[in-house]
Amino acid sequence: MTKEQIIEAVKNMTVLELNELVKAIEEEFGVTAAAPVVVAGGAAAGAEAAAEKTEFDVILADAGAQKIKVIKVVREITGLGLKEAKDLVDNTPKPIKEGIAKEEAEEIKAALEEAGAKVEIK
């Protein structure tokens, strides 16, 4: 029996049949299908994680008085169209970029602040 045939057979099973199959596999091979549980570390582990943060979010807190300049910068950074960039700038606070490197986040923050916006990096 090929993998494809096994997958096709599983696709055609009911939930009850799948449950029985899982139990049979657990008994046959001595394993469990339970998801692994991650134990939370103490305060020291939390401090290490905070110190090692590698991904940052750039949040536009306020567009300031020169919205047109800010919209232009947002369009350059995100590649959004005019309407989407304007909606983003008009509805602050909003994330501009998420999950980026610290250097890139700092560059984006500097460009937006130069245009008159208030920016946060989280």
Swiss-Prot record:
Keyword terms: Ribonucleoprotein, Ribosomal protein
GO biological process: translation
Family matches, as CDD domains: Ribosomal_L7_L12
Presence of the UniProt keyword Translocase in the record: no
Keyword Ribosomal protein: yes
One GO MF term: structural constituent of ribosome
Xref: InterPro entries: Ribosomal_bL12, Ribosomal_bL12_C, Ribosomal_bL12_C/ClpS-like, Ribosomal_bL12_oligo, Ribosomal_bL12_oligo_N_sf
Cellular component, GO, one term: cytosolic large ribosomal subunit
Function: Forms part of the ribosomal stalk which helps the ribosome interact with GTP-bound translation factors. Is thus essential for accurate translation.
Complex and partners: Homodimer. Part of the 50S ribosomal subunit; present in 4 copies per ribosome. Forms part of the ribosomal stalk which helps the ribosome interact with GTP-bound translation factors. Forms a pentameric L10(L12)2(L12)2 complex, where L10 forms an elongated spine to which 2 L12 dimers bind in a sequential fashion.
Family (UniProt): Belongs to the bacterial ribosomal protein bL12 family.
HAMAP family: Ribosomal_bL12
PANTHER family for the chain: 39S RIBOSOMAL PROTEIN L12, LARGE RIBOSOMAL SUBUNIT PROTEIN BL12M
Name of the featured protein: Large ribosomal subunit protein bL12
Organism from which the protein derives: Geobacillus stearothermophilus
Taxonomy of the source species: Bacteria, Bacillati, Bacillota, Bacilli, Bacillales
Name of the gene encoding the protein in the UniProt record: rplL
